[in-house]
Amino acid sequence: MRRLLRDRAGSATILFFGLFFALMLFSFLVLEMGGTMEHYDRAQTILQRSINSAVEANMDERYRADRVLRLNVEGAKASFAAFAAEDMPEGYTFTVQSVTGTADPPMLTAKGTVTFPALFSPFGDRSITVGYTVRAANFAVDGR
């Protein structure tokens, strides 16, 4: 190592810049991946909250006393899209590929993609698109 540092041919400088470049590249990749996971978690939380709210808001209350739970599936589909569009932050876009549900048992599942800006997007027009699947169900758990 000492001989490499005393070498006047410049190989230590080239080695230093090569290692510095590799370290910076690794740092940027770690930061980008961390930012991507943070954005994905934020979008996933909003979508899950939206589908939970859609199921709860569209439960048919007429039969609840008899422990019969029914879901207005069409209303829940519309509510999910409205809740998600209202809560999604600026710069995020989501597309719904399919929303399926059943009235009894009350269950709703949505699949699609969400797109958000990359961490280093100011240095280029880049965005990241990931898929999502969210599911919500409503079951009686009062034990009667």
Residue positions per predicted region:
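Alpha-helical assembly-interface signal, strongest on the long, hydrophobic N-terminal helix that forms
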Residues: 1-75
